[in-house]
C-alpha cells in the first residue's frame, strides 16, 4: 500500500536527508546505520539522539514506521521514493502552471538528478 503524502505534513531538510538514507537501504535500517550513513553521505555528524528525534518526528508525520527487532529499533518507510518524487514535481507544477513543455522537461530532468542523489 502506498501512502499519500499529506500536503499539510511537510518534512524538513534534515528529515529529507534521513528519508533518503532509509529509501536507499535494502532493508529497514537501524539507528546506528542511519546515523553513520547521514555522516558519510551528507557530512552531518549528528548524535544518535538527534537522529532518533528526527525519526520520531517522521513517524508522527506518517512517513515511517518504527519497530523493535531484538533490542534495536528499525525504520520502515511508509511513503515510497516514487510517491515523494511525484509529490515534489506536482508542487513545482503548481508553482509554474504556464511553463512550456521543453522547460518542464529540463526542470524535471534536473529535479530527478537531484532527488536520486
Model-inferred region functions:
Residues 36-46:
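Short helix-coil junctions and helix-kink-helix linkers
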Residues 69-88:
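Short, cationic-aromatic polyanion-contact patches
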Residues 88-117:
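Amphipathic alpha-helical dimerization/coiled-coil segments
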